[in-house]
Design a protein with these regions (language model features):
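Residue-level detector of intrinsically disordered, flexible termini
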Residues: 24-26, 35, 93, 111, ...
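Generic secondary-structure transition motif, activating predominantly at the C-termini of alpha-helices
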Residues: 20, 32, 80, 96, ...
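Substrate-binding surface in catalytic domains of secreted glycosidases
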Residues: 1-88
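Hydrophobic, secondary-structure "cap" segments at the distal end of domains
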Residues: 76-144
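Acidic/aromatic/glycine-rich contiguous surface patches that form carbohydrate-binding/processing clefts
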Residues: 122, 127-192
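Surface-exposed intrinsically disordered loops and tails
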Residues: 13-26, 94, 102-106, 116-117, ...
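Acidic-enriched, low-complexity/disordered segments with a strong bias for Aspartate over Glutamate
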Residues: 15, 59-63, 83, 107, ...
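Generic preference for hydrophobic/aromatic residues in regular secondary structure cores
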Residues: 13-22, 114-117, 121-127, 148, ...
C-alpha cells in the first residue's frame, strides 16, 4: 500500500506535522484514528514487482522425476545466488538458461511460474501476466468498493524482448488493461 502524498495535518500527531518523510506506519496509524479527516485524494495502491526471485531449497533432492523439494511452499535455505548477489533478478536471466526455461510450470496453489535446476540447486519464480491477473482479480473481489491503483515496480526487469516467450512487455500490458478495467468496468466480485 502506498500512502497518500498529501495528508491533512489533522491526520498527523503534532510531532509528525513537520517531519518529512513521514514513516508509512505512522501515516497508517494516523489514518485509522480519524478516517473522517481523510483527504479526498486518498488512494491505495498495490505494488507489483517485475523481478523474479531465486530460492535454494533447505533440503535438496536429486529425484529426476518431479519437483520434489524444488517447489514453492517448501522450506528454503538462507543464502543468495552467488552470480547475482541478490535474491531477485530480471526474469530474462532465468528464461535464457535452458535448464530453467524447459522446467517452467505454473504453480496453481501459489499462482506463480516456477522453474528449477536440481544440478545447480536453485529454483526461480515469477508472476506471469496470467498469474498476476488472477491474483489481482482475487484481491479486488475481496474489496470491491475500494478504489485502488496498480503500481509496477522494477519495470526494467520486465521481458521487453520476449526472451521468455510470453510476449514483449506482457505483464505491463496486462496491468494497464486490468487497471482500466478496474477503473471503468468492474462491477462485482463475480468479475474475475
Amino acid at each position: 500500500m502506498i500512502p497518500p502524498t498529501l495528508l491533512s495535518k489533522e491526520l498527523l500527531t503534532p510531532d509528525l506535522q513537520n517531519v518529512y518523510p513521514v514513516r508509512l506506519a505512522n501515516t497508517i496509524w494516523s489514518m485509522t484514528v480519524n478516517p473522517a479527516a481523510w483527504s479526498s485524494t486518498t488512494s491505495f495502491a498495490v505494488s507489483i514487482g517485475m523481478s523474479g526471485r531465486w530460492y535454494r531449497p533447505r533440503d535438496t533432492d536429486s529425484d529426476p522425476h518431479g519437483l520434489g523439494n524444488y517447489q514453492l511452499g517448501k522450506p528454503c535455505a538462507s543464502e543468495q545466488r552467488p552470480d547475482i548477489q541478490q535474491q531477485t533478478s530480471p526474469i530474462v536471466f532465468a528464461c535464457t538458461m535452458p535448464s530453467y526455461n524447459k522446467s517452467f510450470k505454473v504453480d496453481t496453489t501459489f499462482q506463480a511460474v516456477v522453474g528449477y535446476d536440481k544440478v545447480e540447486g536453485w529454483l526461480f519464480t515469477f508472476d506471469s501476466a496470467e498469474t498476476l491477473r488472477k491474483k489481482l482479480c482475487e484481491a479486488k473481489s475481496n474489496v470491491t468498493a475500494l478504489k485502488l491503483n496498480i503500481v509496477a515496480a522494477n519495470i526494467g526487469s520486465e521481458d521487453y524482448t520476449n526472451q521468455c516467450g510470453l510476449g514483449p512487455l506482457s505483464r505491463l500490458r496486462m496491468l494497464k488493461a486490468l487497471s482500466l478495467y478496474f477503473a471503468h468496468n468492474y462491477t462485482s466480485s463475480a468479475d474475475k
